[in-house]
Every structure is written in C-alpha cells, then in structure tokens.
C-alpha cells in the first residue's frame, strides 16, 4: 500500500493579541449616540460621543490646526480612543502615533523631530490622468534612415508598433528613444505591453495567452488579451505624506556605483530637514493644489504622555498649531496638577501643559470604570485570547480591576490560562486567579513590601 502523508502548512501564524486588538471603532449609532457595549468599548459614552464629533469635523476638513486633550486616570482608555478615531477615519487619512519621550534624541533637535511628525500626519492625494496604449504586439518594425553625421552607418528614425485588443487594432509611430525601452524590456511579437503617452515608458505585462500552447524553455507568464480600446485614459491616485516629499528632496540620489552606496550606508548622522527645504516643498504643494492636481488631507498626530514634553516643545507646538499647514493634534495625559519639564519645581500646571496651550485645547475627560464595566471588558479580552473564564473567576478579576488596576486584572488572564491547562482544565477558575495573585504581585502589595523592608527586598 502506498503511504500518503498530509503536509501541514507551516506558514500560518497565530495572530498576536496586543493591548488594543479588540478596539474596532468608537461604537456610535447613526445619530452619533454611543452604544453601551460596541466596537470594543464599554462605557465612556461622553468621551466617545465627543470623539465622534471630532471625527465628523476631521472628515469635513474643519478641524485642521486644532488640538484635543484626552485627560483621565491610567487605564481609562485614552490610547484606545485615539486608536478608535484613526479606525473611524479609515486607512486613507494619515495617523501618526508618538510618545512624548520619542522626541528627545542625540542626533536631531527635539523641535525638528516634532515638526517631522507634524509633516508625517499631513497627507497629499495626487490625482494624475495617464494616457496609455495597451495591447498585444502584432507588429514591431524599426525604420532606418541615413546617419546625419555621414558615414555608412544608419540610425533608427522611428519604430512602428502594431497593438491589438479585443475591440480593435492600432498602428503607432514611436520615437527612437521608446525603441530603446522596448529593447530593454525584451518585447517581441505576441507580448502584451502598455506604453505611457506622457513619459514614453514601456512595460511588458506578459505573453498573450494565444501563445500558451507553445513550448518554451523559459517559464512565461501568460495574460489575456486586453479588453476595450488600444488608447485608454487611466486616473491614478497616489497618497503621500509631506514628510515623504521632504525626505525625497533632502536626500539627493547619488551614483549607482558601490562607493556611493557604501557612503550612504555609512552616514553617521540622520539628515535634518531644514525649514528652507520645507518651505520649498510647501510652495510646490500649494502650486499643485491651485492647479487641482493634488488635494491636502490633514491627518491626526497623536502624542501620548504629553506631560513628558518640555517647555521648549510646548512653545514650538503653539506656533506649529497656528501654521497654515497643520494636522489635528490629539494629546493624552494621565497627570493632574504637575510641574512642566524645564521650569521651576514650585510652578505647577494642569495636565503638565502650559496655560497658553491649555487655552487652545478641547478637553475630553475619561472616567474610571465601575465593576460591571470591568467585568464586560475582561470577558471580551478573554474571548479574544480564546480563554474560558468561570463567573467566580470573573468576579475575582473584576475586584482586582476596582482595587488595583484594570491592567493588572487583564494581565492575570494569560498566566491563569496556563495554570488551568497545567491542572487539566479547559476553563479558568477562582483557584487559578488566587494562585496567580501569590505568584505575581500588584503595585500596591509591592510598595507595601518595600516600605516594610526599608528599601530592600
């Protein structure tokens, strides 16, 4: 008997669950009212409705250059709200998330790093109409002429290419420079190609499937005969950010030899983009917008832990928000009255931000969760992580969410799942949670031990 073994696919990968994998949107109805449990959110109705209004303002392009502050205690869903805003806006609107401490670097100034992220959050949609000739090559004849410089040699004056589609055929008389592109692509009769009328670039799509019965040593990609006319107009839409344009102009392309490539690899410092270069890019962008070729899309810059910024960054942020090209800035802070970095210790400010910036912000408050809401959040996370939790264990975890923190309660899920499997159970029980409590300390118990042992474990 012939043995047949099934080959298992080794490429399939388990999807990793991050802290905010369960967030799918703000969970609002058609009237903008928050549903109690929707889109991965539980509660926080006022904050979600406020964010829904902000999303509508962003979509109608009436929010650029304004800033929002998400203020609330740790573990109340500030980062989740910012992530939900980005998902409501969709993939076409740029969303740039950063943490306050990311801006401090030895290579680049903090204000330059802040401006770089500002430019990353502003998109440019460029619409271009291209005239294209597409079809199967039925004729390829270069026409020669006498060399104008004299001598016996001849030069190619033009090339005649016949293209065929399902609707008809066309004969094109092309420039000799296009013939060079045809030779580079190794185009022969029977190939399907397309030629861009504006640039003259030639692309070989593949071999026509009419020749699929031919035997060839080289593996060919056979494509069907193009439909429609030979001459077509295609509208191509490209989405880029202003930072992409800055980088493209800041790094001029060197030669293709080994020395220049090695020189680019061994550059010790990051290239700092100057204000002059940015203003030149802005001029070109404004010209494109005036011509109707491009459209500016203000995105979202999310700065988490905004209290980590210093007074210089805040001063720069004030100026950047008032510039003509600015994204929507969403800030998040879990501090109350605290000192601003880079100022005197005795001067305290709300949320760690200066008073003049606070005046420019729309503040959205997030509230702590109650036990019932924590229960729903834990059960949702358990479902996402393919864990079954008994009602007793769920009650115990929700108490941890109230007494300690929601994060601690959620972090106990995975180790409790391992302990239940070790014990031969399919579901997490209260015994597993109790064992996890002994093995893993929460912050309060850890602080108490440190106080009792006078700084030593």
UniProtKB/Swiss-Prot annotation:
Annotated catalysed reactions: ATP + H2O = ADP + phosphate + H(+)
Subcellular location: Nucleus
EC identifiers of the protein: 3.6.4.12
Alphabetical keyword list: Activator, ATP-binding, Chromatin regulator, DNA damage, DNA repair, Helicase, Hydrolase, Nucleotide-binding, Nucleus, Transcription, Transcription regulation
Pfam family, one: TIP49
Main location: nucleus
SMART domains xref list: AAA
Similarity-based family: Belongs to the RuvB family.
Function: DNA helicase which participates in several chromatin remodeling complexes, including the SWR1 and the INO80 complexes. The SWR1 complex mediates the ATP-dependent exchange of histone H2A for the H2A variant HZT1 leading to transcriptional regulation of selected genes by chromatin remodeling. The INO80 complex remodels chromatin by shifting nucleosomes and is involved in DNA repair. Also involved in pre-rRNA processing.
Stated name of the protein: RuvB-like helicase 1
Gene name as annotated: RBV1
């Amino acid at each position: 008997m012939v043995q047949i073994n099934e080959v298992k696919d080794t490429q399939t990968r388990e999807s990793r669950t991050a802290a905010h994998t369960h967030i799918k949107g703000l969970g609002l109805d058609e009237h903008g009212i928050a549903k109690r449990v929707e889109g991965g959110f539980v509660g926080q109705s006022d904050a979600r409705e406020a964010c829904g209004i902000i999303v509508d303002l962003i979509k109608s392009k009436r929010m650029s250059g304004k800033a929002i502050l998400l203020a609330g205690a740790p573990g109340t869903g500030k980062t989740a709200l910012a992530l939900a805003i980005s998902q409501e806006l969709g993939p076409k609107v740029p969303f740039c998330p950063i943490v306050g401490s990311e801006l401090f670097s030895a290579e680049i100034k903090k204000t330059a790093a802040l401006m770089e992220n500002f430019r990353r959050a502003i998109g440019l949609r460029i619409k271009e109409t291209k005239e294209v000739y597409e079809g199967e090559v039925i004729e390829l004849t270069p026409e020669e002429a006498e060399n104008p410089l004299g001598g016996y040699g001849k030069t190619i004056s033009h090339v005649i290419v016949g293209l065929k589609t399902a609707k008809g055929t066309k004969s094109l008389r092309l420039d000799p420079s296009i013939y060079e592109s045809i030779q580079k692509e190794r185009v022969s009769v029977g190939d399907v190609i397309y030629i861009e009328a504006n640039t003259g670039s030639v692309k070989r799509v593949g071999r026509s499937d009419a020749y699929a019965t031919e035997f060839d040593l080289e593996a060919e990609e056979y494509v069907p005969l193009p439909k429609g006319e030979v001459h077509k107009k295609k509208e191509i839409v490209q989405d880029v950010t202003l930072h992409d344009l800055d980088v493209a102009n800041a790094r001029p392309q060197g030669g293709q030899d080994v020395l220049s490539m090695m020189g680019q690899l061994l550059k010790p410092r990051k290239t700092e983009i100057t204000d002059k270069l940015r203003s030149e890019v802005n001029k070109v962008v404004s010209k494109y917008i005036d011509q109707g070729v491009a459209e500016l899309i203000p995105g979202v810059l999310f700065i988490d832990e905004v209290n980590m910024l210093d007074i210089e960054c805040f001063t720069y942020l004030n100026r950047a928000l008032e510039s003509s090209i600015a994204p929507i800035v969403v800030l998040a802070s879990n501090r109350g009255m605290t000192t601003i970095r880079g100022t005197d210790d005795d001067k305290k400010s709300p949320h760690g931000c200066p008073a003049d910036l606070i005046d420019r912000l729309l503040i959205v408050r997030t509230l702590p969760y109650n036990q019932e809401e924590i229960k729903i959040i834990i059960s949702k996370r358990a479902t996402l992580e393919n864990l079954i939790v008994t009602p007793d264990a769920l009650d115990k975890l929700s108490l941890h969410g109230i007494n300690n923190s929601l994060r601690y309660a959620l972090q106990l899920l995975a180790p409790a799942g391992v302990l239940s499997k070790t014990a031969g159970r399919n579901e997490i029980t209260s015994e597993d949670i109790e064992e996890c409590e002994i093995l893993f300390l929460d912050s309060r118990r850890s602080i108490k031990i440190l106080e009792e042992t006078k700084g030593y474990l």
